Amino acid sequence: MKTAAARGATRRDGQPKLGLCVLCGLPAAGKSTFARALALRLRRERGWAVGVLSYDDVLPLALPDCDGTQPRPSQWKMFRQELLKHLECFLVAVISGAQMSAPPNRTEAVWEDFITCLKSQDLMIFPTALEAQPCHLLAKPAVSRPLFLVLDDNFYYQSMRYEVYQLARKYSLGFCQLFLDCPLETCLKRNGERSQPLPDETIQLMGRKIEKPNPEKNAWEHNSLIIQSSACSLEASLEVTGLLLTALENPIKCVEDNTEQKETDRIICSTNILHKADETLRRTVSQTMREAKDEQIPLNNLKHLAEELNKLKADVLEDLRQGNRKYLCFQQTTDLSDIISSFCKERDTIVQKYFSKQH
C-alpha cells in the first residue's frame, strides 16, 4: 500500500499531491477526536502523510493581552492570519522541496507551536533548540507520499474558510470541507465536562451565527460534506475518504473565471464587515432619532421615521449578506465608511421629508 502511495505522490505536472481539509463545527462537537481518527485511518488504509493542525493547540489560550486578559477579537484574527502564513511557508517548502525558514516578524509562541505540531506528526525534522536552527528540514513522509493537512477549528464564518480556499487556489492544491454537525445541547454538555470550558454564552452565540457550507450558493464550497457527529459507520467513513480523494485528484486551478471570482470576493467582503456595519448603523439610527425628537417632530411622524430608517438599515445589511447592489465593491476590502456614507445620504433624504413637515 505504501509503495503505491509513494508512486502516486506526484501529479502529472510533477507537483506533489497536496490537499487542505477544513474541519469545522461548534466547540465540543467532537472535531479533534474525529480528526485524530481520520488521520490514523488515512495513514493506515491509504498510506498518506496526514497532518492535523488544531488551532486550539497552535493558538493557545496562553497568549495573553497586555493587561493579562485573553486576546481581543482583533488579536485573534491577527494570530489566525499569521498561522495561515506559517502554513503557507510549509506548503512552499513541500512544493519546492526546499528547507523551511522561520518567517520574519513572527509571534514566537505561535511559530514554535506550529513547528512542534508538524514534528509530532513526522512532517518536520529540526534540532531541540529552535533558535539554533533557522531552517527546518521536511521529514520524508511529507515529500514522498500524498499529503493532506486537516485544519481543525470552529471556522464558523464562511469568510474564515474562504481564506483557506484562497491559499489552496494560490498553489493549486486540493481543497474540501467537513462540517461536524452536533446538537447545541450536546456541545454544551461536553464543554461543561472540560477542564477549561468556554462560557455557555459563547457557544450559544456561535450556534446562532455559524454558517454551514453552502455549495448551492458558493461554488467554491462544492467539495463539502456535513457529517452528523454520531455517524461513525463504514458508509460515513467511505464518504469522507471519497471526498478527500476527489479533492486530491482535482486540485483547484490557479486561474479561474474572473467574473465569478469577483462576485465571490464581493460576498466574502460583505461577510467580513457585516458585524461592524450592523453596530455602526444601529448607532446612526439611534442618533438620528434623538435629533428628530429634539426637533419636536410629532410622535406619529417619529414612529414612521423610525420604521423607514430601520427598513433602510435592514436593506443595507441584507445587501451585504447577499453581495448585491451598490453598497459593495469588487475589491477584496470594502471601506466601512463608504457604506455608512451611502446609508447617510439615503437617511438624509428620508429625514428631510419629516423635517419639512415641521416648517
From Swiss-Prot:
Gene3D superfamilies: P-loop containing nucleotide triphosphate hydrolases (3.40.50.300). Its EC number is 2.7.1.164. The gene is Pstk. Specifically phosphorylates seryl-tRNA(Sec) to O-phosphoseryl-tRNA(Sec), an activated intermediate for selenocysteine biosynthesis. No activity with other tRNAs has been detected. It catalyses: L-seryl-tRNA(Sec) + ATP = O-phospho-L-seryl-tRNA(Sec) + ADP. SUPFAM superfamilies: P-loop containing nucleoside triphosphate hydrolases (SSF52540). It is an enzyme of class 2 (transferase). It holds the Pfam family KTI12. Keywords: ATP-binding, Kinase, Magnesium, Nucleotide-binding, Protein biosynthesis, Transferase. InterPro entries: KTI12/PSTK (IPR013641), L-seryl-tRNA_Sec_kinase_euk (IPR020028), P-loop_NTPase (IPR027417), Ser-tRNA(Sec)_kinase (IPR052648). Pathway: Aminoacyl-tRNA biosynthesis; selenocysteinyl-tRNA(Sec) biosynthesis; selenocysteinyl-tRNA(Sec) from L-seryl-tRNA(Sec) (archaeal/eukaryal route): step 1/2. Disulfide bonds: none annotated. It comes from the Eukaryota. Its cofactor is Mg(2+). One of its GO terms (biological process) is selenocysteine incorporation. ATP binds at residues 25-32. One of its GO terms (molecular function) is ATP binding. This is L-seryl-tRNA(Sec) kinase. Belongs to the L-seryl-tRNA(Sec) kinase family. GO terms for cellular component: cytosol; mitochondrion.
